[in-house]
């Protein structure tokens, strides 16, 4: 009784083996067709990058197991058009999982290859190892990465050098300004001189911005050697031509532009002495100016200019206080001035009563009757017009004939 079930089990097991062998044959046949399609697609789509996984997948059918189906989505994924890098990375991840399941029970030498593939690398190093170029010693990606590693320390060194360059530029700008003022040149003179010497015209604004560190770092680095060269030439030129200054004065003026006269600085005690002298005599004569210059050990021209400037300053200080108030302007026909009234004597005889009593009165009383019953006795008032001409407008206006 026990043998019959065993025989049936063996028959079922044998039939199962036959079915498995048939399925393996069909799988091997379909796999070979698909791998051929896969290799053709890779050769047409990616001619310069043949994949090594197609060769690894063409192993004998006896070594394959039922897990071969994991490669179907892999081959379908490769046939879909997409970006090369993303497809190759996904292809590698799928192939690694399939190979781990396929070759672990057979103990082949493929895990060593997998270990080489699974080494951690930065960036795209994984794709560069799995996909190689035949006939080339190394891929361009590896060389690109190597060049990137080479360029990195140079960039860091440039960044670290910038603060020192900025400090040097600041120091040079300060020293340049001090030496330029000491030589007596303006910023405009420096720009003109550099244009004549080196062919690059610079405006006064450019030199001013350089001294104030308002230019860009690149422009300041370009301008620094030119300014340094000009400064050295300007300082060395007077010492070389000290023996013949008159012959080379025109040449120096053309080379270095207009040379500004140095500003005269007067000490505090000398200024106080000059102030005292100005309070005593704001406008000294030429002899007095010479005496003051000798006493203070100064040039006569400097003392004279100081007194001129001091007088102008005094005028600016006192001018608003001493301005006279302007008298109102009136027409000469309307109201006479006070001076004309003082110099004029007027005698008017009029009759303001029936008794014909005469009395001096104001001009208005003589020109018109003071009461309704009064009569005008003298039609022409006696007026002393000394200092006035007969044709003056005031006289004609006040004349009695204008009222008739």
Swiss-Prot record:
GO terms for molecular function: DNA-binding transcription factor activity, RNA polymerase II-specific; RNA polymerase II cis-regulatory region sequence-specific DNA binding. It comes from the Eukaryota. Residues 187-235 form the POU-specific domain. Residues 1-29, 44-67, 346-367 are annotated as: Disordered. One of its GO terms (cellular component) is nucleus. SMART domains: HOX, POU. Pfam families: Homeodomain (PF00046), Pou (PF00157). Keywords: Activator, DNA-binding, Homeobox, Nucleus, Transcription, Transcription regulation. Residues 16-29 have a biased composition (Basic and acidic residues). Disulfide bonds: none annotated. The keyword Membrane does not apply. CDD domains: homeodomain. One of its GO terms (biological process) is regulation of transcription by RNA polymerase II. The keyword Transport does not apply. Residues 259-297 bind DNA. Its main location: nucleus. It is found in: Nucleus. Residues 350-363 have a biased composition (Low complexity). Belongs to the POU transcription factor family. Class-2 subfamily. Transcription factor that binds to the octamer motif (5'-ATTTGCAT-3') and regulates cell type-specific differentiation pathways. This is POU domain, class 2, transcription factor 3L. It comes from Xenopus laevis.
């Amino acid at each position: 009784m026990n043998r019959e079930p065993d025989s049936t089990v063996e028959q079922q097991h044998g039939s199962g083996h036959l079915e498995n062998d048939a399925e393996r044959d069909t799988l091997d046949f379909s796999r070979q067709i698909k791998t051929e399609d896969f290799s053709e697609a890779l050769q047409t789509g990616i001619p310069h990058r043949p994949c090594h996984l197609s060769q690894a997948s063409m192993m004998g059918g006896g070594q394959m197991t039922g897990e071969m189906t994991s490669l179907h989505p892999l081959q379908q994924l490769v046939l879909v058009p997409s970006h090369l890098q993303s497809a190759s990375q996904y292809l590698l991840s799928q192939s690694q999982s399939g190979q781990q399941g396929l070759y672990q029970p057979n103990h082949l030498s493929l895990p060593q290859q997998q270990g080489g593939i699974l080494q951690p690398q930065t960036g795209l190093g994984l794709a560069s190892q799995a996909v190689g170029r035949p006939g080339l010693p190394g891929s361009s990606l590896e060389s690109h990465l190597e060049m990137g590693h080479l360029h990195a320390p140079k960039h860091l060194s440039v960044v670290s050098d910038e603060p020192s360059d900025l400090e040097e530029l600041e120091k040079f700008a300060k020293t340049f300004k001090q030496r330029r003022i000491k030589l007596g040149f303006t910023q405009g003179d420096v720009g003109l001189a550099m244009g004549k010497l080196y062919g690059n015209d610079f405006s006064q604004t450019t030199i001013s911005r350089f001294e104030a560190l308002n230019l860009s770092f690149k422009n300041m680095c370009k301008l620094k050697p030119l300014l340094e060269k000009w400064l050295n030439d300007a300082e060395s030129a007077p010492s070389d031509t000290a023996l013949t200054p008159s012959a080379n004065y025109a040449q120096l003026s053309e080379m270095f532009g207009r040379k500004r006269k140095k500003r005269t600085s007067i000490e505090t005690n000398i200024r106080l002495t000059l102030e005292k002298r100005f309070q005593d005599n704001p406008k000294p004569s030429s002899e007095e100016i010479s005496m003051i210059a000798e006493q203070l050990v100064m040039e006569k021209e400097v003392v004279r200019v100081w007194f001129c400037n001091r007088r102008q300053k005094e005028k600016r200080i006192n001018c608003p206080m001493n301005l006279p108030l302007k008298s109102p302007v009136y027409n000469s026909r309307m109201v006479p001035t006070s001076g004309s009234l003082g110099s004029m004597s007027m005698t008017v005889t009029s009759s303001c009563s029936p008794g014909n009593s005469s009395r001096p009165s104001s001009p208005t009383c003589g020109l018109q009757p003071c009461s309704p019953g009064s009569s005008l006795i003298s039609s022409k008032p006696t007026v002393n017009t000394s200092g006035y001409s007969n044709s003056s407008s005031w006289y004609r206006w006040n004349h009695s004939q204008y009222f008739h």
